[in-house]
Swiss-Prot record:
GO terms for molecular function: magnesium ion transmembrane transporter activity. Keywords: Ion transport, Magnesium, Membrane, Transmembrane, Transmembrane helix, Transport. A motif (Required for magnesium transport activity) lies at residues 336-338. Belongs to the CorA metal ion transporter (MIT) (TC 1.A.35.5) family. It is found in: Membrane. It is a multi-pass membrane protein. The chain crosses the membrane at residues 316-336, 352-372. Magnesium transporter that may mediate the influx of magnesium. GO terms for cellular component: membrane. It comes from the Eukaryota. This is Magnesium transporter MRS2-8. InterPro entries: MRS2-like. Disulfide bonds: none annotated.
Amino acid sequence: MLPNEELVPVKRITPQSSWSWISIDATGKKTVLDVDKYVIMHRVQIHARDLRILDPNLFYPSAILGRERAIVLNLEHIKAIITAKEVLIQDSSDENLIPTLEEFQTRLSVGNKAHGGQLDGDVVEEDESAFEFRALEVALEAICSFLAARTIELEKSAYPALDELTLKLTSRNLLRVCKLKSSMTRLTAQVQKIKDELEQLLEDDEDMAELYLSRKLAGASSPAIDSGEHINWYPTSPTIGAKISRAKSHLVRSATVRGDDKNDVEEVEMLLEAHFMQIDRTLNKLTELREYVDETEDFLNIQLDSSRNQLIKFEIILTAGSICVSVYSVVVGILGMNIPFPWNIKKHMFKWVVSGTATVCAILFVTIMSFARYKKLFGF
C-alpha cells in the first residue's frame, strides 16, 4: 500500500432490526408499533418464512396466506397481518397506503358498532361477519380499486398516444408508446398475480376455511381442546415441533368447524368471488388494451412494409436507368475517341449511331420495367 493512499471506509449493510407497524383493532383505534420482527412473530403466531414475504427490502409476489392465528397479506403496497382481533399493517412511505389506513379505521369501527360491541370472549355471532372477514374485505377492495384506478389512468394515456402514433410515426411518439407498454406489462403482471391468488383460494375449500380465524380461535378455547394441554408443549427439535403444530391445527379444525365448514366456506367464497370478478374486469380492460397495442403494431408494420416496398420500387427504377445510361455513355465515349475507323469519313453517321444507341437504351429500360411489373415487383 502506498504511504499517501487513503483508506475509504466501507459501510456495512445490516438487516433492519425493527419494523414500524400500525395496529388497528375492532374499534378502529390506531396504534403505531416499532418492534422487532420476533415480537410480531410471537404476537400473531406465524413463522419467519411467512413474515419474510412482508419484508420491504425483499421482492415477493402478491400472496394471501391463511395460517392458524393470522392471515398474511402481501398485496403490492398493502402488507398486513390480520388476526381475529386486530390488523397489523406495515408502515411505509407509500402515499397510496394513507387512504387504505383511513378506510380500515372507518370500516372496522363501523362494523364494530354494527355488532353492538357484543363479543363473548373470542366467539363471534353466527349471523355477523367476523372481524377478519371485514378486514380482508377492506384490503381486497383497496387493492382492487387501486389497480382499477391505475388501469383507467393508463387507458387515458395509452389510447390517445396510440392514435397519435398511427397518424404520425415519430421517434418521440414511439418512445412514449414504449414507456406506456412497459407500464402496461408491469400492471398486467400485478393484476394477474392477484387474480391467480384469489382463484387458487376459490378452488380449495380448505384454504378458504383457514381464513375463518374467529371460528378456530373459539374452537381452541373449547373444553375438547383444553383437555389436551399437553399438545401445547413443543420439543426442542424444530421438525418434531412443526409436526405437533400441524397435528394440533388439524385437531382444532376437526373439533370446531366440522359442522360449520359449509357456512364458513360460503361466506368466504362470496367475499372472494366479488373481488375476483372486480379484478377480472380490470384484467379484461388490460387485455383489450394489449390487443389494441398489438393491432397498432400490426398497422405500423404494414405501413413500414409499404414504405419499404416503395423504396425497393424506386431502387429498381434507378438501377434500370443507371444501366441504360451506362450503355449509352460507353457507346458515345467510344465514338468520341480520336481513333481512325471508316465511320468517321461518312457524313451523318455519328448522329445515326447516337440516336440508335439512345433508342436501344430506351427499349432496354422499358423491357426491364415490363419484366419487373410482370414479376409483380412493383405491387401492381
